[in-house]
Amino acid sequence: NVNDELNITGTTMTIDADEDAVKVDNDEDTSVGTMYLSDNKMTITAGDDGIHASGDLIIDSGTYQVTESVEGLEGKSITINGGDITIYATDDGVNAANANANQDEIFFTMNGGTLNVEVGQGDTDPIDSNGNVTVTGGTINLTGQSGFDFDGTATYTGGDIYINGEKQTEIVNSMPGGGGAPGGGGPQGGGPGGGHP
């Protein structure tokens, strides 16, 4: 557990943790608590978060398997530029959140790589951002009751997104009353699952 900054490059690790597995945490200062990961091969089993940063979490390259966690990736902001990431979580798979930060500091951005997320049953979200969601590239495969839950806006300009095997043409907020209609997409209509009970 590190307070301000953690940079991990070129390692091979297998981690079995009772709580958070890879963690950088600074509760006092939201401008630090940063984690940078590149060219690693990590296999993680966690009793709580697989990879946790109280600040910015940046993944540039490498292979990351979180085989068991409550939340797979958590950061104030999460930026994925590359790499191959596979997550199983019993709560949110990827969670961009920090109660002490401003909403404009909180976001999920995917520019490249592959992100596979499966979540357990219940009120769970494969990708949950307390701010904005931006996808410009890469491939996202989400398995769960929903896909995205965000409080800001969603921008989707490139890459491929699949939810439960179905290719998406826009990012739809699973939480009604969230951040407004992404891209002016309007209601989803009679998609799978139709009118929610």
Where are these regions (language model features)?
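A composition-driven surface/loop motif
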Residues: 1-197
